[in-house]
């Protein structure tokens, strides 16, 4: 009978009541009521058991058997030693896990163990090494509403990093952009603000962690409020351990190049829709340390706007360019993840091997310091403090790389460190030798060839004899346990040896645990120095990664433009070029933009000619420049850009009821409402999601508006509306096109950008090579010829009226003309201009 069918029976409810009335289940329920939103891992011996609704949820996610305790209580369980794999799967499903451990009997003679929740693991609070994704950051966000501002904190508990910032309630795009960069695996909001955030469009399908305790502070303490919420959540999830976060970094507006979420996605900086390969990050990540890899990703997502920072990075690169990098790279490979090691030390999750990793890191760091001093590289590590830590650890740590994963499962402290420890180890070794010797003697004395002496944690040491020979056991054997195929015994001599071994083990465990804790405390005294060391290592690794990319791909050092112009000579797309098949070369292109006469390039050319690639490579070269990297070009002179916008491609947001065109217009509006004179804007096919004339009118209006500005943002405007090329007569606008070559019935896309405008779109040819059936392609060609012929006839008729026809008069009424003349275009936003244009259009249609 399954669970559903029994749930309606009186017998089931009676059995359930009885089952829940046991001391153990009463204990479970008492603990569970304090952690209702978690799956409770209830330790019972060598297993974590889950009961009731927790069991149903966990068994479904983990694909493990759901059974019933006393025929009523749903339950499932996992071995304690393999919990990480199961916890990881639950976290990926968005669940929280409360780890409830057993310690000692509740009272003398009681079978019920004392149990307490020692840790709550949530998606954003993971610090356990086996649950983290390699070197990747694991962020948690806290949002806090205060009047008209949203304050937010982004923290990685595994590294201790914290970032603070704030945005206006009306400027949510920046908040969304920051969340897109950090991609927090958990977002926390105060209980009183939950409804506000839940109703925002971006968060509609997002689960929040609701912070129950409301923190009251003054108006000026908003960042302090975030700090208190973070610390409160640490106490709640880590249960009174020493985990602390570092000093926060402020993400102030203007310090870094701003990119909205569409730009981050369109440029595929650190991931694309399908994978994390073939991105800007993946192709020039040559870092050898975890810190270096994280730092490279951060700097790609937060390019600098301060030229002083860029010059500092270039100076370091210039020093390294004069040296051989191979020895530095070899040394960097020995570095452990110091940030996470320190976090594990604070969070009571340290491993013995962490000390070996720390020791190797310090040793390599000291060697690097000596080598880099020879070339005057500013490698500012606290050398004296590091030597103190190294000496302290070396005095104690067992040499070699065979340290145990878990304390107690092998040798941790070196021989000679403690006389008492050495004696206990010797006694333990002798005791085990005595066991082997006793087994040999007992086999010979009894003549029982199935006799073996074994050990487990529950029974201890025992003599095991098969059931067939058990009756022949000597009288001095004391029966200990009966199994299906064997009997287990003990004897006075074995018990004596066992006491010796167990006493020795207790001494070893006590000394090693005490010294382990002391070593952790000593290392934490130098945590500030170690974090500074980690930062220097990460920055060196970052610089060497940039130099490696330069050598591998043939990139060059860009120059800073003093006049705000952008000048790329034979630039290339870094990702496309790096992923081309062997023997295939990327065709380079040049571009020049300024803020006056050459500010706005109208880019035309057929589909597949390379318009989007060209625009993306400009953006990626700009980003590489502003992180201090080399760029793929023959030469480059680039400005500091404060905001980078891309409107490339659009997909329906059907879940929000938004069409392709609406999404396109929202993105366009965001750009036109937030650009500055120092922005770089890349528009691709604006207006294609609606009718031809509507779309062209909008695109035309945008270009006119940008042209009318006294200082124009640098803009590339790719379009299929060839009529827009006529706007080159306006100030600041010029034409570019992708060159093609017609050869018999073929079209060659030459991928070369030239000054001027494209002659054809070649859409029918693209349809043909895409596999559209031949009859359809043929008919399309006929229709195109017909339409183009009519278009020419209309133009001729408009240009040369006959003697027998009167010229057509434009029936604008005086009121409309007067309204147009009164418009103050310089005071109108682009959206207001579009709305006014739409109103005039409606009036003219009514006149017709």
UniProtKB/Swiss-Prot annotation:
Keywords: ATP-binding, DNA damage, DNA repair, DNA-binding, Nucleotide-binding. ATP binds at residues 605-612. Coiled coil: none annotated. GO terms for biological process: mismatch repair. One of its GO terms (molecular function) is ATP binding. Pfam families: MutS_I (PF01624), MutS_II (PF05188), MutS_III (PF05192), MutS_IV (PF05190), MutS_V (PF00488). One of its GO terms (cellular component) is cytosol. InterPro entries: DNA_mismatch_repair_MutS (IPR005748), DNA_mismatch_repair_MutS-lik_N (IPR007695), DNA_mismatch_repair_MutS/MSH (IPR017261), DNA_mismatch_repair_MutS_C (IPR000432), DNA_mismatch_repair_MutS_clamp (IPR007861), DNA_mismatch_repair_MutS_core (IPR007696), DNA_mismatch_repair_MutS_N (IPR016151), DNA_mismatch_repair_MutS_sf (IPR036187). Belongs to the DNA mismatch repair MutS family. PANTHER family: DNA MISMATCH REPAIR PROTEIN MSH1, MITOCHONDRIAL, DNA MISMATCH REPAIR PROTEIN MUTS FAMILY MEMBER. NCBIfam families: mutS1, PRK05399.1. This protein is involved in the repair of mismatches in DNA. It is possible that it carries out the mismatch recognition step. This protein has a weak ATPase activity. This is DNA mismatch repair protein MutS. It comes from Leptospira interrogans serogroup Icterohaemorrhagiae serovar copenhageni (strain Fiocruz L1-130).
């Amino acid at each position: 009978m399954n669970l559903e069918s029994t749930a309606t029976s009186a017998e089931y409810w009676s059995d359930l009541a009885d089952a829940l009335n046991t001391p153990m289940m009463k204990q479970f329920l008492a603990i569970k009521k304090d952690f209702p939103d978690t799956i409770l891992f209830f330790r019972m011996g060598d297993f974590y058991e889950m009961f009731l609704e927790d069991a149903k949820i966990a068994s479904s996610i983990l694909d493990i058997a759901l059974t019933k305790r006393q025929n009523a209580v749903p339950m499932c369980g996992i071995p304690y030693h393999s919990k990480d794999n199961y916890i990881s799967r639950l976290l990926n499903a968005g669940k929280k896990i409360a780890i409830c451990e057993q310690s000692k009997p509740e009272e003398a003679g009681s079978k019920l163990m004392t149990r307490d929740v020692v840790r709550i693991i949530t998606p954003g609070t993971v610090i356990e090494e086996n649950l983290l994704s390699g070197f990747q950051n694991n962020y948690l966000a806290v949002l806090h509403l205060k009047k008209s501002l949203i304050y937010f904190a982004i923290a990685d508990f595994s590294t201790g990093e914290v970032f603070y910032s704030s945005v206006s309630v009306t400027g949510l795009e920046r908040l969304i952009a920051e969340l897109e960069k950090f991609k927090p695996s958990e977002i926390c909001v105060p209980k009183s603000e939950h409804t506000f955030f839940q109703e925002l469009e971006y968060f509609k399908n997002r689960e929040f962690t609701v912070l129950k305790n409301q923190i009251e502070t003054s108006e000026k303490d908003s960042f302090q409020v975030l700090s208190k919420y973070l610390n409160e959540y640490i106490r709640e999830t880590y249960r009174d351990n020493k985990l602390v976060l570092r000093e926060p970094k402020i993400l102030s507006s203007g310090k870094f190049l701003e990119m909205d979420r569409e730009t981050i996605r369109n440029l595929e900086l650190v991931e694309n829709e399908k994978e994390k390969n073939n991105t800007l990050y993946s192709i020039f990540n040559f870092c050898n340390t975890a810190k270096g890899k994280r730092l490279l990703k951060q700097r790609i997502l937060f390019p600098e706007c301060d030229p002083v920072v860029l010059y500092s990075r270039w100076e370091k690169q210039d020093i390294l360019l004069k040296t051989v990098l191979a020895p530095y790279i070899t040394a960097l490979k020995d570095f452990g993840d110091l940030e996470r090691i320190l976090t594990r030390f604070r969070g009571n999750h340290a491993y013995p091997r962490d000390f070996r990793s720390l020791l190797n890191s310090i040793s390599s760091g000291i060697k690097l310091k000596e080598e880099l001093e020879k070339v005057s590289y500013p490698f500012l590590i606290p050398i004296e403090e590091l030597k103190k830590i190294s000496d302290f650890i070396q005095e104690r740590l067992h040499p070699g790389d065979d340290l145990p994963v878990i304390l107690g499962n092998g040798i941790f402290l070196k021989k000679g460190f403690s006389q008492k420890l050495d004696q206990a180890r010797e006694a333990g070794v002798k005791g085990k030798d005595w066991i082997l010797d006793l087994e040999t003697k007992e086999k010979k004395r009894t003549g029982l060839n199935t006799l073996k002496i074994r050990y487990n944690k529950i029974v201890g040491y025992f003599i095991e004899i098969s059931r067939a020979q058990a009756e022949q056991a000597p009288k001095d054997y004391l029966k200990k346990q009966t199994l299906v195929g064997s009997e287990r015994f003990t004897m006075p001599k074995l018990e004596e040896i066992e006491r010796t071994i167990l006493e020795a083990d207790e001494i070893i465990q006590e000394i090693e645990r005490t010294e382990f804790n002391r070593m952790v405390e000593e290392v934490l005294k130098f945590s500030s120095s170690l974090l500074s060391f980690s930062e220097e290592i990460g920055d060196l690794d970052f610089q060497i990664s940039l130099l490696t990319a330069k050598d591998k791909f043939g990139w060059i050092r860009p120059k800073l433009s003093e006049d705000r112009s952008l000048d790329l000579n034979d630039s290339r797309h870094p990702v496309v070029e790096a992923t081309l098949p062997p023997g295939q070369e990327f065709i380079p292109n040049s571009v020049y933009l300024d803020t006056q006469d050459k500010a706005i390039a109208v880019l035309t050319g057929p589909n597949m000619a390379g318009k989007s690639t060209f625009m993306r490579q400009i953006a990626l070269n700009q980003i590489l420049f502003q992180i201090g990297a080399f760029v793929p070009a023959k030469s480059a002179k680039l400005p500091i850009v404060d905001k980078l916008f891309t409107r490339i491609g659009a997909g329906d947001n059907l879940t929000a009821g938004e069409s392709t065109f609406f999404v396109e217009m929202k993105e366009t509006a965001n750009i036109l409402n937030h650009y500055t004179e120092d922005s770089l804007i890349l528009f691709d096919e604006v207006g294609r999601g609606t009718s031809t004339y509507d779309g062209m009118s909008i695109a035309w209006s945008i270009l006119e508006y940008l042209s009318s500005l006294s200082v124009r943002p640098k803009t590339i405007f790719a379009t299929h509306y060839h009529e827009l090329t006529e706007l080159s007569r306006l100030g600041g606008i010029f034409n570019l096109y992708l060159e093609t070559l017609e050869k018999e019935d073929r079209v060659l896309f030459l991928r070369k950008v030239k000054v001027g405008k494209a002659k054809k779109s070649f859409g029918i040819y693209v349809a043909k090579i895409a596999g559209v059936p031949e009859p359809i392609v043929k008919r399309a060609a006929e229709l195109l010829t017909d339409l183009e012929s009519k278009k020419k006839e209309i133009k001729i008729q408009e240009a040369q009226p006959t003697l027998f026809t009167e010229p057509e008069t434009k029936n604008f009424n005086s009121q409309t003309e007067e309204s147009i003349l009164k418009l103050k275009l310089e005071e109108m936003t682009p959206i207001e201009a579009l709305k006014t244009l739409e109103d005039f259009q409606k009036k003219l249609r009514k006149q017709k």
